Amino acid sequence: MAEKSSFFVHFSCLLLLLTIIITCGEGVRNPVRPRSSERRALMDGQDLSRPLKLTFGGPSRNWTDAIPIGNGRLGATIWGGVSSEILNINEDTIWTGVPADYTNQKAPEALAEVRRLVDERNYAEATSEAVKLSGQPSDVYQIVGDLNLEFDSSHRKYTQASYRRELDLETAVAKVSYSVGAVDFSREFFASNPDQVIIAKIYASKPGSLSFKVSFDSELHHHSETNPKANQILMRGSCRPKRLPVNLKKSINATNIPYDDHKGLQFASILEVRVSNGGSVSSLGGKKLSVEKADWAVLLLAASSNFDGPFTMPVDSKIDPAKECVNRISSVQKYSYSDLYARHLGDYQKLFNRVSLHLSGSSTNETVQQATSTAERVRSFKTDQDPSLVELLFQYGRYLLISSSRPGTQVANLQGIWNRDIQPPWDGAPHLNINLQMNYWHSLPGNIRECQEPLFDYMSALAINGRKTAQVNYGASGWVAHQVSDIWAKTSPDRGEAVWALWPMGGAWLCTHAWEHYTYTMDKEFLKKKGYPLLEGCTSFLLDWLIKGKDGFLQTNPSTSPEHMFTAPIGKPASVSYSSTMDIAIIKEVFADIVSASEILGKTNDTLIGKVIAAQAKLPPTRISKDGSIREWAEDFEDPEVHHRHVSHLFGLFPGHTITVEKSPELAKAVEATLKKRGEEGPGWSTTWKAALWARLHNSEHAYRMVTHIFDLVDPLNERNYEGGLYSNMFTAHPPFQIDANFGFAAAVAEMLVQSTTKDLYLLPALPADKWPNGIVNGLRARGGVTVSIKWMEGNLVEFGLWSEQIVSTRIVYRGISAAAELLPGKVFTFDKDLRCIRTDKL
């Protein structure tokens, strides 16, 4: 990008009205959402205080209509029925299986044969032989069960026009309301992170009008009983110690297949009911509680398992899940409902309020927005292209990660934490060839870095099992992880065909997140204690995995491009060859990351770093096919599926950094050709990945086109595989539901507005000025530990603000104009459209 002007800035400024500073518990200052009055002032009188709410005009008919809530560990989906209400309850450690050794003692022999066949360019036979490297399937994410509420028959006569159901993203509270005659009934639900319980309040406008029954149920082995003295129901249950068969026919009722109750994970859930004075609670048949003639009732739900880490057999666990639940319920006895709500709100908003986004460009009336269900708004997006719906989906991604991944929890899996099946699609397992990584793409730019902590805990567990897999399967040092994992930190290849199972780059891709975490936070202690050890072990494996090829370059052999076949020279389908473009791109990224990390930590003289630097010079370049696109494989094979959903060979552009518009324009041009060749259709996660790729190319038109593709309302009873879209609760569709695209969408929108390296900051690099002509984004994070706020009008930058927790030297770039700036801690900078500092103040 041409440099038209440059100047050095060494003072700090206050970003007036865009940035408010709060102090978090750890002492870090963070910008929060501006008050609505300030938002109005910033947009010259335009009211930007649109509610961030998902709204529904009736009860759920399908699970993908239900409202998700969560506190990172506990989750629920709320159906919002009138005469009966269902909450599907999830707890993030409810899984099948036990710790197991899935290493393959016969793998080294098979590996040698596969490599021989690849060397002979017999790729079809190598693909067949590579099945011998496959292993056992992962275990399966389960559901605790359902909480059922049955209201008296009068509720069936509710006034349909009075019904409203909503999820407020600013408070993380779900609400259901309706009227029966002259009585208004309301329910509120939230999942408290500070108190580790799910809380509901149900109330009626007329005293004594609230009566209902409540009970537990589960498809897993379970037993429930009431404790009338404490107004409680306790459910105990157990998970299967071994997953159901992979190919179990759908016609078979899985709940009837017996299993050993004692070997798998044990779980418990407790519900306690509080009622107003004058109301009563009694036991029905020892299984249900009955509430009669109350003004209001508060439900407190706790759930837990005896999971004690991925290396402890459930039978050896010292954790009593029922006792855990009792303790959690007991710990909140001192709090009123208002207290519980305030504690929840303070915890949640500390994270959520760090970023706000306001886009204008639509004539959609505010009143119409509030009266129209979210599903109808999605349906009409193709015609009105309402930017407030983009705001909503962006913030929904942040809401969902805050709700499904918190310090100390498990990672957000393929469905976050929300699941209603004992056989969920793709086992609900973490998939490491795009899906798990995409879950966390927006955690750093979206300014919720704490939510990424479970990923590094998980990687530490993978590193332990991965050392066994690397040593036994491949005779290599370090650690490795493949395509699919589970709560037991499985690292060996999955079952089945090599096209998906044989992919030893899952751990390496995850390791790039460790370096990214450092670049966004500049947390040297994290890098030293957690990030670098993970990179070190991964790098050791990669160095051993690389072998010298006939062309003199180091190569990976065998190698696949995730889930994609090619046509071998003999005309047969194959997936196994050598040095797929993604393999090499990930290795280049990891090697660059560990070299950079070694410089920060003073480890440049380590033997490992010397080996890495020597290997870097021997890695093959990214190659361009004869049609001008990026090659997916080392050879220019015929691609039988040019519109394949994966775009793995473009990793080097995004989320990687080895291809850039500025430094490698020829490769960037080839990436553009590749994206056009691949096409725009695909599942949700593919769509959002392509949006981020186009944004990295600074192509606002195509980035926005991919954004619009996500707004396609999906009928869960008539799904079309691989076509993406949104369900009515704004869960993203593969179909079926996968949560990755919810997170990928937030990352892609952030990428359209701000891009960065540790030395460069690009403002509005892919802004669709004709679609979002006016806007404010507040609180996005950039590499270098910089927080960014931007205001633009009529498609042009007006002003922006920067602040950092440490000294940062950066180059600010906007439309070819660049300026050098040095940010000082405790200061905030405000710049105008010409990148000149216009105001200054201390924090």
UniProtKB/Swiss-Prot annotation:
UniProt xrefs under Pfam families: Glyco_hyd_65N_2, Glyco_hydro_95_C, Glyco_hydro_95_cat
Keyword Hydrolase carried by entry: yes
Disruption phenotype: No visible phenotype. Higher abundance of fucosylated oligosaccharides and presence of unusual oligosaccharides.
Glycoprotein recorded as keyword: yes
Gene Ontology cellular-component terms listed: apoplast
pH dependence: Optimum pH is 5.0.
Tissue note: Ubiquitous. Highest expression in vascular tissues, leaf trichomes, root elongation zone and emerging lateral roots.
Leader sequence residues: 1-27
Known EC number: 3.2.1.51
Catalysed reactions, semicolon-separated: an alpha-L-fucoside + H2O = L-fucose + an alcohol
InterPro entries listed in its UniProt record: 6-hairpin_glycosidase_sf, 6hp_glycosidase-like_sf, AFCA-like_C, Alpha-L-fucosidase, GH95_cat, GH95_N_dom
SUPFAM superfamilies per record: Six-hairpin glycosidases (SSF48208)
A GO biological-process term: carbohydrate metabolic process
Alphabetically ordered keywords of this record: Apoplast, Glycoprotein, Glycosidase, Hydrolase, Secreted, Signal
Location(s) in or outside the cell: Secreted, Extracellular space, Apoplast
GO MF, any single term: 1,2-alpha-L-fucosidase activity
Domain of life of the organism encoding this protein: Eukaryota
Glycosylated residue positions: 62, 253, 365, 605
Family: Belongs to the glycosyl hydrolase 95 family.
Purpose of the protein: Hydrolyzes alpha-1,2-linked fucose. Also active on fucosylated xyloglucan oligosaccharides. No activity with 3-fucosyllactose, p-nitrophenyl-alpha-I-fucopyranoside, lacto-N-fucopentaose II, lacto-N-fucopentaose III or alpha 1,6-fucosylated chitopentaose. Involved in apoplastic xyloglucan metabolism.
Protein known as: Alpha-L-fucosidase 2
Protein species of origin: Arabidopsis thaliana (Mouse-ear cress)
Source species taxonomy: Eukaryota, Viridiplantae, Streptophyta, Embryophyta, Tracheophyta
Gene: FUC95A
